[in-house]
């Protein structure tokens, strides 16, 4: 799998449960990569694949 997950807009890509791509924003997985967020962060749990340390969380700011 391409580590950059560079699929075309509206295309598909194979997003694993644990995020190994750098910019995965594909309709096929309906998730985007973000830093790991605190357990209580519903937004991150619903829309992100965990990547990075929790102290660098950006999707729940």
UniProtKB/Swiss-Prot annotation:
Entry-annotated residues carrying N-acetylmethionine: 1
Gene Ontology, cellular component aspect: cytoplasm; nucleus
Alphabetically ordered keywords of this record: Acetylation, Metal-binding, Metal-thiolate cluster, Phosphoprotein
In-chain residues carrying the UniProt-annotated modification Phosphoserine: 58
SUPFAM superfamilies associated with the record: Metallothionein (SSF57868)
Binding, a divalent metal cation 2: 7, 13, 15, 26
Residues engaged in binding a divalent metal cation 3: 15, 19, 24, 29
One Pfam family of this chain: Metallothio
Membrane-spanning residues: none
Molecular function (Gene Ontology), one example: metal ion binding
Function: Metallothioneins have a high content of cysteine residues that bind various heavy metals; these proteins are transcriptionally regulated by both heavy metals and glucocorticoids.
Subunit and interaction comment: Monomer.
Record comment regarding domains: Class I metallothioneins contain 2 metal-binding domains: four divalent ions are chelated within cluster A of the alpha domain and are coordinated via cysteinyl thiolate bridges to 11 cysteine ligands. Cluster B, the corresponding region within the beta domain, can ligate three divalent ions to 9 cysteines.
Name of this chain's protein: Metallothionein-1A
Source organism per UniProt: Bos taurus
């Amino acid at each position: 799998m391409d580590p950059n997950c560079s699929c075309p807009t509206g295309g598909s890509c194979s997003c694993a449960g644990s995020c190994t791509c750098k910019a995965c924003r594909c309709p096929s997985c309906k998730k985007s990569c973000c830093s790991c967020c605190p357990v209580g962060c519903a937004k991150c749990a619903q829309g992100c694949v965990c990547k990075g340390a929790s102290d660098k969380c950006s999707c729940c700011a």
